[in-house]
Amino acid sequence: VIFSNLFHHILIRYKIHLKVSIDGAEETHNRNRKWVDGGGSYANIIDNCMYFKEYENQTKQSIQAAHVVTQNNYGETFRSVCHLVENLNFKVVDSSIDVVHRWTIDQLDGLADEWEKVLCYYIKRQKVGKAFLWGPVLDLKKYGENNGKSGFCGVGLIQIYVKVDGRIFGCAANLESSGCIGDVENGLSMDRIKRLRKLEEEGTMCSKCNLYRECQ
């Protein structure tokens, strides 16, 4: 996002919760986060840091780093989280796994090692009074509070996922056409939302999900 003073004022005035898509240090981030001309977007995020700080100071809300772990950057997961916390001062890092592509067992094993490093880092910073919030830990806590039931994320109710092509999805775990609920030009489609709410269509990504019975 290219910030303007008006846009920044609106975010602060209405205390809109803000997430910044950033996957780590410059080389890691620019590997997947590119503009249409092929250039990476990391420098643009850094240019907006002064706006981020003012937003947090005035709203008393922390900006979240939306950190996506993919097949070509999972080996840098630990270093990326450290960079976001220590160098860019994010207090909330929402790490999520790219579920669009099928992962191999070896890749998942490697990711598990990185996940463990981040968890140890999370615990260590808590002990020394420099805690940050890490998305996977928050998700596990909420999952336990709901007695193992899902639905706490409020997909389609309090959050949506917008792809770079403008299509809107209710759940980041279903980015197939069956999960599309509208687009930025025409808005949300109530027909599509109602169809997803019924969850009656067989063979869709949603119907195959083992948590869909509790999905909001």
Which residues does each predicted region cover?
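Short, solvent-exposed loop/turn segments at secondary-structure junctions
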Residues: I2, A25, T70-N72, V99-R102, ...
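C-terminal accessory region of radical SAM enzymes
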Residues: D113-G144, I168, A172-Q216
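Short, acidic, Ser/Thr-enriched surface-loop or helix-capping motifs
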Residues: K163
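Short, small/polar residue-rich loop motifs at catalytic or cofactor-binding pockets
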Residues: C153-L157
